[in-house]
Design a protein with these regions (language model features):
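Short, positively charged and aromatic/hydrophobic N-terminal segments
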Residues: 2, 7, 11-14
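Metal-dependent phosphodiesterase/phospholipase catalytic core, i.e.
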Residues: 19-28, 75-182, 208-242
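Hydrophobic faces of well-ordered beta-strands that scaffold small-molecule active sites
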Residues: 30-32, 59-61, 138-140, 166-169, ...
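Glycine-rich beta-to-alpha transition loops that act as phosphate-gripper elements at the mouths
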Residues: 34-35, 42, 170, 194, ...
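Catalytic domains of carbohydrate-active enzymes, especially glycoside hydrolases
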Residues: 50-63
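Glycine-rich, proline-tolerant flexible connector loops at the mouths of alpha/beta enzymes
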Residues: 65-77
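C-terminal active-site rim and adjoining tail of enzyme catalytic domains
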Residues: 199-295
């Protein structure tokens, strides 16, 4: 695979982005989706510790606001799918949530066995995650659409002096606007609305400039939105030239991983970080990969 150099303006744009936002130093490649979720219950401490031991670059996770204004790590809106509890996450206090079995429904054999049921795995708070893994970078999706969540979230991040190792994400533009206002030095992705706006502009011929002040530092997108193909060579080149990173979610197929890396994806979300590590190890990528892109 040939990796031709970007022009000088694009390289300067990447350099500026990296200097201003330390989360991208060094730029991540492997984002473990909800931790090592292939082998452990997702978004739990064992999944996070395993991901750290695998030396992944970033753990991707999700947070909700609890009924007592704390921040709990969990993906789903409800508790029914993964725990022995039931109901909306945000209706419970952190203490109540931590009484639930977060490994209750984890299975690798279509429900024949539940190896983590009753082993003491509970939901955890954002505070616990940052305390337990002080050197890990986190990509955190703020799920609750509530103005109190960004406030409490940045308070906890500040308490742990963790701003440089957090990338804030959310489907809700209001959450990201609040994060950028409350903690301007924190890296953020683009919301769904922001991505869609940039996508449409790019399709209409808009070419983003490295001189523009973008709200976020990274586009985190699927390869397709329904019938729309997002990741084209033109799309990737346009935003790379403007200094914007591109992360792709969620890829678990080896052939897809190889293809996206060769296209120039900066990082990939995966449930199977072991496989992605193997793929990266087999593809000859130069050390200065993030200053080069595939044609």
């Amino acid at each position: 695979v040939q990796y031709p150099p970007l022009d000088n303006s694009a390289i300067l744009a990447y350099s500026f982005c990296m200097l201003e936002h330390n989360f991208f130093t060094p730029p991540p490649r492997i984002l473990a989706h909800r931790g090592d979720s292939e082998f452990y219950p997702e978004n739990t401490l064992p999944a996070f510790i395993s991901a750290e031991r695998l030396k992944v670059d970033v753990i991707e996770t999700d947070v909700h606001l609890t009924a007592d204004n704390d921040v709990v790590i969990w993906h789903d809106k409800t508790l029914d799918h993964q725990t022995n509890g039931s109901g909306i996450v945000e209706a419970f206090t952190l203490k109540q949530l931590k009484m639930l079995d977060a490994g209750y429904y984890y299975t690798k054999d279509d429900g024949k066995t539940f190896p983590f049921r009753g082993t003491g795995i509970t939901l955890m708070s954002l505070d616990e995650a940052l305390e337990t893994l002080p050197d890990m970078r986190f990509n955190i999706d703020l799920k609750t659409k509530d103005s109190r969540l960004p406030v409490k979230f940045t308070e906890i991040v500040g308490k742990h002096n963790a701003m440089d190792r957090i990338l804030g994400a959310s489907f809700h533009t209001e959450n990201l606007q609040a994060l950028r206002s409350l903690m301007p030095g924190m890296s953020t992705s683009f919301s769904t609305y922001e991505v869609f706006t940039l996508f449409i502009k790019q399709k209409l011929g808009f070419r983003p400039s490295s001189r523009e002040k973008f709200k976020g530092q990274v586009l985190q997108v699927p390869e397709r939105y329904g019938f729309l193909k997002v990741l084209t060579d033109r799309f990737m080149r346009s935003f790379h030239d403007a200094g914007i990173y591109i992360h792709v979610w969620t890829i678990n197929d080896e052939a897809d991983m190889r293809r996206l890396i060769r296209m120039g994806a900066d990082a990939i979300f995966t449930d199977n970080p072991r496989l992605l590590q193997k793929v990266y190890a087999a593809i000859p990528i130069p050390k200065n990969y993030f200053k080069y892109r595939a044609e």
